[in-house]
A protein has these predicted regions:
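Conserved catalytic network of the ASCE P-loop NTPase/AAA+ motor domain
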Residues: 8-9, 77-84, 256-260, 265, ...
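Conserved Switch II/interswitch segment of TRAFAC-class P-loop GTPases
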Residues: 23, 55, 59, 94-97, ...
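N-terminal accessory targeting/assembly segments
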Residues: 1-119
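Short alpha-helix plus adjacent loop in nuclease-associated cores
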Residues: 117-138
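Switch/connector loops and helix/strand junctions flanking conserved nucleotide-binding motifs
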Residues: 24-27, 58-62, 97-102, 119-122, ...
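Switch II of P-loop NTPase G domains
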Residues: 2-5, 31-34, 57-74, 251, ...
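C-terminal-of-GTPase-core extension/linker across diverse P-loop GTPases
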Residues: 1-16, 37, 148-226, 232, ...
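Switch I (effector-binding) loop of TRAFAC-class P-loop GTPase G-domains
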Residues: 210-213, 234-264, 273-283, 308, ...
Length: 418
């Protein structure tokens, strides 16, 4: 097969496409496209244009209507004539094989959807054998129903270079062209092998968790890029990789933390996101087991994000999907130093909205009813960290007494309190 040489220095340009529907208004669509742009940037692409269209629902054949597709095609043509090549078009929903095939036939350009973009980022971020295996399985699950389309367009688009390699063009990292040459039966066999590997990893991880001793397990959960790893570094007093990009953390990091006299285990897990591919959730079972088996969840929220309440809902839904709903939880609102609001003019008589509330006013809304289950901090600026440690200490101590009432390894001050 012909070899493809991909320039490392060249940044691929991308066009984003989203829909405004009855259940997704223009503001929400723009917010979703902002997130999609951040995903594209994390994958190494540069977003140069956005298109939106109002429809009752996505068009079953081409996602957008014929007129909008023609508008996108005209834009790409004009850019090419001006010697500004467009590398790809990314759609903000998962596309069917038929939709991808029809859109590619019309636009004659690489087409990605939100799912394939997220999978690509996971392939780029995967470092350990465990993470690479989980990502590869998820990619094959996504690829299988689209295999015919991938065969058709493989030679024109070029191949990837293996999950975790971080090389190759956006959307094509991971299994790569050698795997795409396989027939359906061979891919199914490969998936079966990957599942066996993950089952063995699950056993090993389960054994490791059982051997950690009589310690309460606390897991950091939350939307992606809310500051979990930064908080992990502060609490554990050890460096944990943190970066202002989505999915900076894929593999679970577990550290032993001691607050005052009380030791416990703290884990930093992969962040959640809207429309998280089901195949990823299924494939990352061994990673998410840290959340499922935790005694206490610290749900970290970026309060400076305009849609933080929806992000809370996304995380809670994902927790329910993986069987971790109903666990003891502390809601930790992070990044209070970055919180902003829109101050209304004195002559503005329109009703105040959430965007007009100061942080102090926001704290007096539904959050005030949560009492000690709700905290406000800045991990970056180390604001209210002592309050957080105090609350975590009390909750971990309560859980420890309940779970290990006869444990005698704790220090004298703790024994006196009991």
């Amino acid at each position: 097969m012909k070899e493809f040489v991909i320039s490392e220095a060249k940044v691929e340009t991308a066009v984003l496409v989203g829909l405004i529907t009855q259940t997704q208004d223009e503001r929400k669509t723009n917010e979703y496209l902002d997130e999609l742009a951040f995903l594209a940037e994390t994958a190494g692409a540069e977003v140069v244009k956005r298109f939106t269209q109002k429809l009752d629902a996505a068009h079953s054949v081409t996602y957008v209507g014929k007129g909008k597709l023609e508008e996108i095609k005209e834009y790409i043509r004009n850019e090419e004539e001006a010697e500004r090549e467009i590398g790809m078009v990314i759609f903000d929903d998962e596309l069917s094989a038929k939709q991808i095939r029809n859109i590619e036939a019309e636009l004659k350009i690489k087409i990605l959807d939100r799912t394939s973009l997220i999978l690509d980022i996971f392939a780029m971020r995967a470092q350990t054998a465990n993470a690479k295996t989980q990502v590869e399985l998820a990619q094959y699950k996504y690829m299988l129903p689209r295999l015919q389309r991938l065969w058709t367009h493989l030679e024109r688009q070029g191949g990837g270079s293996g999950a975790g390699g971080g090389k190759g063009s956006v959307g094509l990292r991971g299994p790569g062209e050698t795997q795409l040459e396989m027939d359906r039966r061979i891919i199914l066999n490969r998936m079966s092998l990957l599942k066996e590997r993950l089952a063995e990893i699950d056993k090993q991880k389960s054994t490791q968790r059982k051997n950690r001793g009589r310690l309460i397990r606390v897991a950091l959960v939350g939307y992606t890029n809310v500051g979990k790893s930064t908080l992990m570094t502060l609490l554990s007093k050890s460096e944990v990789f943190a970066e202002n990009k989505l999915f900076a953390t894929l593999d679970t990091t577990v550290r032993k933390v001691i607050i005052e006299n009380l030791p416990f285990l703290l884990s930093d897990t992969v962040g959640f996101i809207r429309k998280l591919p089901t195949d990823l959730v299924d494939s990352f079972k061994s990673t998410l087991d840290e959340v499922r088996e935790a005694d206490l969840l610290l749900h970290i929220v970026d309060i400076s994000h305009p849609d933080f309440e929806e992000q809370i809902e996304v995380v809670n839904k994902t927790l329910a999907d993986i069987g971790a709903a109903g666990k003891p939880m502390i809601l930790v609102f992070n990044k209070i130093d970055a919180y902003t609001y829109i101050e209304k003019a004195a002559d503005d008589l329109t009703p105040r909205t959430k965007e007009n509330l100061t942080l102090e006013e926001l704290m007096k809304t539904w959050m005030a009813k949560m009492e000690d289950n709700c905290l406000f901090i800045s991990a970056r600026e180390k604001i209210n960290m002592e309050e957080l440690k105090s609350v975590v200490y009390q909750r971990v101590k309560e859980l420890h007494v309940q779970k290990y009432p006869y444990n005698d390894f704790l220090y004298q001050t703790y024994e006196e309190e009991v």
